[in-house]
């Protein structure tokens, strides 16, 4: 399962977690993805989109 938005392409970002004693360990930031039924080329399909695309109106929901 890809952790990537089907519309904007937003995906996982890798960085470092920094503890109080400045020990660095790798960690990931994952986008807030939701599975929604949306119209893609005029047909309803289940796609995985981030909440920013949902809120901005880039998704046409299928009823």
From Swiss-Prot:
The keyword Repeat does not apply. The keyword Ribosomal protein applies. SUPFAM superfamilies: L28p-like. One of its GO terms (molecular function) is structural constituent of ribosome. Belongs to the bacterial ribosomal protein bL28 family. HAMAP family: Ribosomal_bL28. This is Large ribosomal subunit protein bL28. The lineage of its organism: Bacteria, Bacillati, Bacillota, Clostridia, Thermoanaerobacterales. The gene is rpmB.
């Amino acid at each position: 399962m890809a952790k990537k938005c089907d519309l904007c392409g937003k995906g996982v970002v890798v960085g470092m977690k920094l503890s109080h004693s400045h020990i660095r360990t790798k960690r990931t930031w994952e986008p807030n993805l939701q599975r929604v039924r949306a119209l893609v080329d005029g047909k309803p399909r289940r796609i995985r989109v981030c909440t920013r695309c949902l809120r901005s109106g880039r998704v046409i929901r299928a009823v």
